[in-house]
A protein has these predicted regions:
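Pepsin/retropepsin-fold aspartyl endopeptidases
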Residues: 1-126
């Protein structure tokens, strides 16, 4: 499967005076959380809520700032989440993708809203 990217809007819902940022994000269902580079956390004036330990792809562990809240928008979908500050690009993990009911389309290398629920996100609560 190649790399799948999508264009998302990130904003700080506690700071409506700050403009949202349009970003290209790597969508990875194998990752869990939203991860953003430090410069985006600064631009959105996101405060550190706590520190979290993360396990990186190479197996190393480190602690990183967990900031928020972050509003993530994609087409007619949005969610509110926190973000871990690390890396040099935006990484959209499974939690925000599930929250917005998004699907990955590997054949098109794209992110899309779930075609089975195009108007309203669906969640499973069993």
């Amino acid at each position: 499967m190649g790399l799948i990217r999508g264009t998302f809007s990130l904003s700080n819902p506690t700071r409506p005076d700050l403009a949202p940022l349009e970003v290209s994000a790597l969508a990875d269902s194998g990752a869990v959380h939203l991860c953003i580079p430090e410069h985006l956390a600064i631009q959105l004036s996101l405060g550190e809520l706590e520190r979290r330990e993360v396990v990186l792809a190479d197996g190393h562990r480190r602690t990183v700032p967990y900031v928020g809240p972050v509003e993530v928008r994609f087409r007619n979908r949005r969610c509110f989440t926190g973000a871990m500050v690390l890396g040099n690009e935006v990484l959209l993990g499974a939690i925000p993708m599930e929250d917005m009911d998004l699907v990955l389309r590997p054949q098109l290398q794209s992110v899309d809203v779930n075609p089975e629920s195009p108007n309203i996100p669906v969640s499973v609560a069993k």
